[in-house]
Amino acid sequence: MLLGIFSDVHDQLQNLQRALGVFKQRGAATLIFCGDFCSPIPARVMGAFAGEIHCVFGNGDGDRFQIARIAHHDHPNLKLHGEHAELEFEGHKFAVTHYPFYAKALASTGQYRAVFSGHTHVLSEERIGACLWLNPGEVMGWKGRPTCALYDTHTNAAEIIDLA
């Protein structure tokens, strides 16, 4: 199963559209968003994606009430999990959080095939035992290189996608 992984949109809609287009083109029917919509506008754009998008909140999400309203009333494919999520795909457990401090701790437990996080705006991949800890970088492009990732549940590996 191919999962689209992305984080830190910060209202950068052009790069968000690129990421969603790549996910659709490459066959990722389920996406994981590691936080920081910022305003509710990206939630509307993400809601147009045909598949499920599992989302956690980040520190930059100012109007969580409006984002939740959009998800619950207008775009039920947006699955809001609060500050963190524990998901299962094809018999494997995955954890999602915005914050790297918590992600590293979760990855260290040995309970997850992979843990996904954001916040730093810096792409990183680390193996902690058998667990892959992935920060897909930032959709925003604030640090210069907008990226997202495609994660393969069979191989436990990620392909980094440059959105520039």
Specify the residue positions occupied by each region the protein language model found.
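Ligand-binding grooves and catalytic loops that recognize ribose/phosphate and carbohydrate rings
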Residues: 55, 59-85, 129-135, 142-143, ...
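Active-site metal-binding loops of divalent metal-dependent hydrolases
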Residues: 7-10, 35-37, 58-61, 99-100, ...
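Short connector loops at helix/strand junctions that flank enzyme active sites
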Residues: 50, 82, 89-91, 111
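Glycine-rich phosphate-binding loop signature in dinucleotide/nucleotide-binding domains
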Residues: 23-27, 89, 109-110
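N-terminal active-site segment of His-dependent metallophosphoesterases
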Residues: 1-48, 52, 62-76, 82, ...
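Residue-level detector of beta-strand face positions
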Residues: 86-88, 125
